[in-house]
């Protein structure tokens, strides 16, 4: 047998490349290297529903025959090398691509993914998803360029309601789409933000962010903060005016935090408006979704300026990205409103440097009395699965020598702790988790700005400012990580992957060891 005897449609090829263990031959037999493969039943159902499409009548049951995995692999490689169809897909091909797209999205959704990455290479398509912050394969790599090209093209050209342009493999593109899908919480309308960037060899990457994944808004008491953090935020929420900025990486929970705060503040006698790109939570207040168009750098500013005429008490801007956006936030804070916004930087103290040095907000404005009130940095770290977590003694058996050294350094930096309270991820995992972890919790640090802070911000002496904060008892994100490690909530090495400085470093020892022979 050879690849020419394999029946091929887009739907069948999706099943072949997804399972990589079963194919349907022109004589109506199924060749498989795994009799338990789910692909066998999927192909049977497909043929039963469409017997005329495959050139033979459906028998009571298709004959399943065993073949080696090497044969299957070779046949799939041969299929992927065949000349692709013309770019203008037939109606049948488009229909099959639509089925493929929905299947990919539903697989990702049912895994609890926040993002889908479709990576297009010269002779291969890769599909990966982000679950609890970790990138994992959605399916095995598909040895075909056309698979990914058609999939991305269909998403942009047929499903996107708002996009920069029609899809072209060599052009940056952005868009949004909505699709009814089966989710872990039942069938519902899912909303996606798409971004595409080209790469070498006519490749590229399409990233899909599930923007309305969460169906409910958590309370401030349930986002992983300590009670003291919540009290500080509520003090700010009850103030007359001022700015709260929340920093962090992409997917660090910043928008969720603001949603929790605004949800608590609504219907309390104050007018609330948000300007977002895009709207992610339904807050029950006036929310404006801003659409970026090519060549329009000030689109966000036009909306925020319009809100000056709308008698707003509390306002939230999705993200500060540039000088214009930063000055908008400062302007609103000066007009007597409570302002929330987010930005990308790596610490709460770093907000000052980012706004001043990168976005050119004058230090005098940042240090203005009662303007900047609360700066927060947060990140998300995976939590240890309670069903298969390891004790310290069990975990040590799985660690590398480097991990043992790091743990010893961390242990020496702790004043005292109960080793029995520590818990570590089980690399083998269980049916309830992925590699020993399930879900995520928040690690944060807060700066509650006072006049001493403002004086040091004005002088731009950020190292002195950090020292002064520590004297006052400032709790850093490292401190919060250590607290949750000691409680057994998070694995120390998972936390170290999200928080710098968890393992203290002696730079003298580092430099002296650079040329030591291993």
Task: Describe every region a protein language model picked out.
Residues 1-14:
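Short Lys/Arg-enriched alpha/beta "domain-start" segment
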Residues 10, 17-57, 78-245, 249-252, ...:
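N-terminal "pre-motor" subdomain/linker immediately upstream of P-loop NTPase catalytic cores
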Residues 37, 122-124, 135, 183-184, ...:
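Conserved nucleotide-binding/hydrolysis micro-motifs of P-loop NTPases
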Residues 116, 192, 236, 277, ...:
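Residue-level signature of catalytic and energy-coupling elements of molecular machines
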Residues 221, 230-232, 402-518:
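NTP-binding/hydrolysis catalytic cores, primarily Walker-type P-loop NTPases
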Residues 242-244, 259-384:
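Switch/coupling sub-region of P-loop NTPases
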Residues 252, 347-448:
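Cys/His-rich Zn2+-binding cysteine-cluster or related metal-binding knuckle/ribbon modules and their
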Residues 255:
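Walker A/P-loop
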């Amino acid at each position: 047998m050879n690849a020419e005897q394999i029946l091929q449609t887009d739907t069948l090829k999706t099943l072949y490349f997804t399972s990589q263990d079963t194919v349907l031959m022109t004589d109506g037999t199924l060749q498989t290297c795994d009799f338990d493969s789910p692909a066998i039943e999927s192909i049977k159902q497909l043929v039963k529903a469409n017997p005329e499409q495959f050139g033979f009548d459906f028998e009571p049951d298709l004959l399943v025959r065993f073949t080696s995995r090497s044969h299957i692999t070779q046949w799939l490689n041969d299929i992927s090398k065949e000349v692709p169809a013309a770019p203008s897909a037939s109606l049948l091909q488009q229909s099959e691509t639509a089925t493929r797209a929905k299947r990919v999205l539903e697989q990702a959704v049912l895994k609890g993914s926040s993002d889908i990455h479709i990576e297009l290479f010269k002779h291969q398509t890769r599909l990966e998803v982000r679950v609890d912050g970790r990138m994992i394969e959605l399916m095995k790599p598909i040895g075909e360029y056309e698979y990914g090209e058609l999939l991305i093209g269909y998403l942009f050209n047929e499903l996107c309601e708002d996009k920069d342009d029609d899809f072209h493999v060599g052009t940056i593109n952005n868009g949004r789409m909505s699709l009814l899908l089966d989710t872990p919480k039942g069938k519902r309308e899912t909303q996606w933000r798409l971004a595409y960037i080209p790469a070498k060899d006519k490749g590229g990457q399409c990233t899909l962010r599930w923007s309305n994944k969460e169906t409910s808004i958590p309370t401030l008491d349930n986002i992983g903060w300590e009670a003291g953090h919540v009290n500080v935020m509520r003090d700010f929420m009850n103030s007359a005016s001022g700015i709260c900025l929340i920093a962090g990486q992409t997917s660090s929970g910043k928008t969720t935090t603001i949603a929790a705060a605004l949800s608590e503040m609504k219907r309390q006698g104050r007018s609330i408006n948000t300007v977002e790109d895009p709207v992610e939570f339904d807050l029950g207040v006036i929310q404006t979704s801003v659409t970026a168009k090519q060549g329009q750098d000030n689109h966000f500013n036009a909306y925020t300026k319009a809100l000056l005429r709308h008698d707003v008490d509390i306002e939230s801007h999705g993200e500060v990205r540039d000088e214009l956006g930063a000055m908008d936030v400062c302007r609103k804070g000066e007009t007597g409103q409570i302002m929330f916004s987010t930005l990308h930087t790596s610490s709460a103290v770093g907000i000052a440097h980012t706004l001043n040095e990168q976005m050119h907000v004058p230090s005098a404005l940042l240090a203005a009395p009662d303007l900047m009130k609360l700066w927060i940095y947060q990140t998300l770290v995976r939590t240890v699965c309670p069903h298969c977590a390891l004790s310290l003694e069990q975990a040590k058996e799985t660690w590398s020598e480097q991990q043992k050294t790091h743990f010893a350094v961390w242990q020496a930096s702790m004043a005292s702790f109960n080793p029995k309270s520590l818990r570590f991820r089980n690399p083998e995992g269980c049916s309830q988790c992925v590699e020993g972890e399930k879900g995520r919790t928040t690690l944060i640090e807060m700066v509650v700005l006072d006049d001493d802070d403002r004086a040091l911000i004005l002088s731009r002496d950020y190292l002195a400012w950090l020292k002064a904060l520590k004297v006052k008892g400032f709790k850093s994100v490292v401190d919060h990580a250590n607290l949750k490690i000691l409680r057994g909530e998070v694995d120390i090495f998972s936390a170290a992957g999200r928080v710098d400085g968890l393992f203290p470093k002696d730079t003298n020892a580092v430099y002296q060891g650079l040329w030591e022979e291993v």
